[in-house]
Amino acid sequence: MMKTEREKMTAGESYQEFDTELITRRKFIRQQLQEINQITDNDNRNHRFQSLLAKTGTNFFVESEFKFDYGFNIHIGDHFYGNYDITMLDTCPITIGEHCYFGPNVGLYTPVHPLDAKRRNADVEMGAPITIGDSVWMGGRVTVLPGVTIGNRVVVGAGSVVTKSFPDDVVIVGNPARIIHHLDQDGNVIKN
């Protein structure tokens, strides 16, 4: 049996972004988000967000202007806080661990566009998943690119662009992000 475009997309394979099923879902999500982001009652707003996502744990809270493409590829653990203007482009799975906190304007981007102009012009897209461990804190305006895994207990400095994967217990900053400190499991900087 042939895979659907949604199945190919979620698996990180080449797919047609203008597939009818995908267009219908994106349109539905945009309409829902436009309405939900206007809700001032925090509990109601966050309950509505949760209903559109694949999985959320307990104590899920996102401020308004939360944006994503599909929702069915977003998996978030317990105790998540997202500040204003969080964007998750979820063509592939985005998995976020427990006790994670995102500053304003954090962007997680799984889509990958072909370098070959002919393939781009044919509306072919791909993607790569993003995985974020437990107890990760991201400062404002952090950007995480496709295929990145961020370990447990990582701090990502404001404005960083994360282009590659990082291990547990580090502080990363910059564009592209680089390690500036290693941490012990209590969060203390390890002196060299």
Q: Could you say what each language-model-derived stretch is?
A:
Residues 6-7, 52, 98, 122, ...:
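Short secondary-structure boundary/capping segments
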Residues 1-59, 177-192:
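Terminal amphipathic alpha-helical/low-complexity segments used for targeting or macromolecular assembly
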Residues 37, 164-169:
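Short arginine-rich
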Residues 66-150, 170, 175-192:
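Flexible, glycine/small-residue-enriched loop-and-beta-strand segment within the central core
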Residues 45-48, 140, 158:
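Hydrophobic alpha-helical segments typical of transmembrane helices
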Residues 153-165:
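C-terminal/domain-terminus segments
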